[in-house]
Amino acid sequence: MQKQIIEILKEIRPEFEFEGVENFFDEGMLDSFDLMTLVSTLDERFSIKIDGTDILPENFANVESIEALVQRSKKR
C-alpha cells in the first residue's frame, strides 16, 4: 500500500521525493489544497471515505501515517 500512496503523492507533487520524509507539511511538500486533493484521491483509489474529523495534519504527515489512516477507514 505504501507504494500506491507514494505514487498518489507524486501525482499531486511530482517535484518531491516522499520516501523517508518525517513530515510533509514541515518540509513544505504539501499544503492545504494538496491535502484536499490527496483525501479525494485516496477515497477514490482505495474505495474508502475519510471522515472530516480525520482530516488532521498528523494523519497525513508521512507515508506511514497515511497508510494507517487508510487502514482505519477501510474498517468502517
Enumerate the language-model features and the residues they cover.
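Conserved catalytic core of two-component sensor histidine kinases
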Residues: M36
